[in-house]
A protein has these predicted regions:
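Residue-level marker of beta-strand positions
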Residues: 32, 65, 84-86, 102, ...
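Mid-domain Rossmann-like dinucleotide-binding core that forms the NAD(H)/NADP(H) cofactor-binding site
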Residues: 125-203
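Glycine-rich cofactor phosphate-binding loops and adjacent beta1-alpha1 units
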Residues: 188-278
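C-terminal capping/lid region of NAD(P)-dependent oxidoreductase domains
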Residues: 215, 305-306, 310-319, 327-345
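C-terminal substrate-binding/catalytic core of Rossmann-like NAD(P)-dependent dehydrogenases/reductases
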Residues: 267-319
């Protein structure tokens, strides 16, 4: 059978995505589950993270968010049996590409998929759901009555954060990156308190947030990237400046950032200290990179798929791509021209 792999380029060279022949071992491991893949989500490969974790291969398997049907289980598997519909995220060191017809995965990375939830929907949204849940529950400890500012609420991750927060009785403010996204966010139900446009050049972020919170600032800020310096490149011009984020935080607030290389100067740290605020880095990969909190991770995955099934989380539908377009599609995803894609098998 065939799978999608990435041949990492030399230093700055573009990575190459190739369809490669692959096979599974004859004997199934005791705790492994053999799954026939129905849909697979594609997200950018983080080469730096793989390097940091010491995972180095000539061919890196691509496509990790999978949904499918159990075909066979190892003799010590207790959670699943053949014909079960399952969903999960392959660990970073998995030898399998999620884009194979059949994969092998440890039972502790899978949860049951509710019957009425489509494989395509869950494969496309599972990672964003995991990020949103980790940011809001694990890091920010959100509770009813809190105020939350989500940057770029129309992104797939931002939308998940908004829906999850509204479900828990949190007052949500968000920013929009274009007039179309602004309209989309204003029409969301349950509705957000305020949509703040940041595409006009001048950002009124601080005065609007202070007005909406009675001058107190928000309890939680979730960003999707930060501008570190005043000069703007085309890529970063819509991102908030780190000083703006610290300014909108209330006393005891939580800032959850996705910015891997965030640099704070002593005055920034002093400002955070004066507010007794905290900063957390959002790296959802720790759930599969370490087995320290496996039970909690499975509980989160289960909660996400149940909320999707119940209609609490309603991800934007992803258009499905046929398998023969996988290499081209993955190249556009890797260049961040497209956030993600779903391949239906």
């Amino acid at each position: 059978m065939k799978g999608l792999y990435c041949r990492a380029g030399e230093s700055d060279a573009e990575p190459k995505f190739v369809i490669q022949e692959t096979s599974l071992p004859e004997v199934l491991g005791s705790h492994l589950v053999r799954v026939q893949v129905k849909a697979c989500g594609l997200s950018p490969v983080d080469f730096k993270l793989l390097e940091d974790l010491g995972i180095q291969r000539d061919l890196i398997p691509v496509g990790r968010e999978v949904a499918g049907v159990v075909m066979q289980v190892g003799d010590k598997v207790s959670f699943f049996q053949p014909e079960d519909e399952v969903v999960g995220i392959l660990p970073l060191d998995s030898p399998c590409s999620g884009l194979c017809d059949v994969i092998e995965i440890d039972e502790h990375y899978l949860v049951q998929k509710p019957e009425k939830l489509s494989s395509v929907c869950v494969a496309g949204a599972l990672r964003d759901g995991l990020c949103a849940h980790t940011a809001l529950h694990t890091h920010a400890r959100m509770a009813a009555g809190h105020t939350l500012l989500v940057m770029d609420g129309a992104s797939s991750f931002g939308l998940m954060c908004i829906q999850l927060a509204c479900h828990h009785g949190v007052k949500v403010l968000t920013t929009s990156h274009s007039p179309q996204k602004h309209t989309f966010l204003e029409q969301l139900r349950p509705s957000v308190v305020k949509v703040i446009p940041v595409y006009n050049g001048s950002s009124d972020l601080l005065p609007v947030v202070l007005e909406e919170t009675g001058g107190l600032g928000v309890d939680i800020v979730i960003d999707s990237g930060v501008r570190l310096h005043e000069e703007e490149s085309e890529k970063t011009k819509l991102l908030p400046h780190k000083h703006d984020i610290i300014s909108v935080l209330g006393v005891g607030g939580h800032w959850v950032t996705s910015h891997k290389d965030l640099q704070l100067d002593p005055p920034d740290c002093r400002f955070l200290y004066l507010k007794s605020a905290s900063l957390t880095f959002l790296n959802h990969e720790v759930w599969t990179a370490s087995s320290a909190q496996q039970g909690r991770y499975l509980h989160i995955l289960k909660d996400i798929v149940e909320k999707m099934s119940a209609g609490v989380l309603r991800p934007q539908p992803e258009e499905t791509v046929p398998l023969y377009e996988a290499t081209v599609t993955m190249a556009t995803v890797q260049r961040h021209q497209k956030k993600k894609a779903v391949i239906q098998l």
